Amino acid sequence: MTTRPTDNETDVASVTFDAESENPQARREHTSYSARRSIVTLLQLEKYSALWVWAGLILIFALWVPGTFLTLSNVQIILSSQAVTAIVALGLIAPLAVGAIDLAAASAVGFTGMFGAVLMAHSGWGAVPTIAATLVLGCCIGALMGVLVSVVRISAIIVTLAASSVLSGMVTWLSASQDVVGLPSQFLSIGSGTALGLAWPFWVMLILCLCAWVFFDHTATGRYMHATGLGPEAARVSGVPTTRLVVLALTLSAAAASVAGLLGTARIGAGDPSFGPSYLLPAYAAVFLGSTQVRPGFFNAWGTVISVYVLATGVQGLQLAGAPVWIPDVFNGLALLAAVGIAVVRQRIAAHRALARVRRLVMSRASR
């Protein structure tokens, strides 16, 4: 499908052409700029720069620690072990899309994992009813937070921070600060089973990624969520049900956290009271870094998953090279700062370019 240039675009193009024809220096600068743009377009750097970074990291660590990094077992470990982080990150896309911050996601991972473990180990529930009950509970927690944010009008940061504290306390109460063991083999097989050499959680994550991609990029509700985040008042005036969308967003985030909690517990093999909180930072780092990929400027599923594995590759490579145990936290924190910084710089560059085009257009019309 071809599009016809607008009058403004035609005017800007003519002004640029006139300026270049009169000024050889401008013409050379334009040629250099065009060459750089051609390289960027060829390599798809604006959309897929993380893939090139990922390839670079793989090459660096393959040369640095060749005996351990570039092996089949290490690739399987990276892909399988990061599935839970990726699921948490996919869930965070929803609240961020509507302009909310969910600080309870990681605590919800720990709580739902412990809740499911207690039901099976202490109450004798089977795997299937436990999974169903845990998912329902997770959705109810998310919906309650959504109501407090969108209906009662309490700040999302306050609501989710309070919820995080409550859920962490509930984990301690349910577990008595002890591991909950004795989970049924049917449930444990979800975490230990493999297909094509990769753990089941990886395939669950991949399915959820596909669902998130369809929902956020190809449905009206997903587009309305992005519209709500970009301008809630404008979206509300336009008829977008922003209140319901905020409730839905936090419900989806909690549902994803519940899935992650169950899968993580199945993979560990027991209910671990310390499980969950450590996922918050890498998940947010991946979501913000993902917003600079695939669909720059929008929180999106594929960019998020790619970013999860870029960060995981860096951390795993450093650990195999003998880096200290505190490296993952530092690495993910710096990655979060870098991701937000890149997003801000891109917005400013886009605004600067738009302003420059407007100025050239105004000057051309004033000179006529």
What are the language-model segments listed below?
Residues 152, 156-218, 245-248, 267-276, ...:
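Transmembrane helix-bundle core of multi-pass membrane transporters
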Residues 40-42, 96-101, 120-122, 126, ...:
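Short loop segments and helix-boundary regions at transmembrane helix junctions
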Residues 50-63, 91-92, 164-168, 204-213, ...:
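Hydrophobic core segments of alpha-helical transmembrane domains in multi-pass membrane transport
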Residues 48-52, 78, 86, 107-111, ...:
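Hydrophobic alpha-helical transmembrane segments
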Residues 55-123, 147-154, 287-301, 334:
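Single transmembrane alpha-helix segments in multi-pass membrane proteins
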Residues 257, 267-332:
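Transmembrane alpha-helical segments in multi-pass inner-membrane proteins
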Residues 125-130, 134, 140-145, 149, ...:
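Helix-loop-helix "hairpin" substructures at the membrane interface of multi-pass membrane proteins
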Residues 2-59, 237-244, 314-368:
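Cytosolic-side transmembrane-helix boundaries in multi-pass membrane proteins
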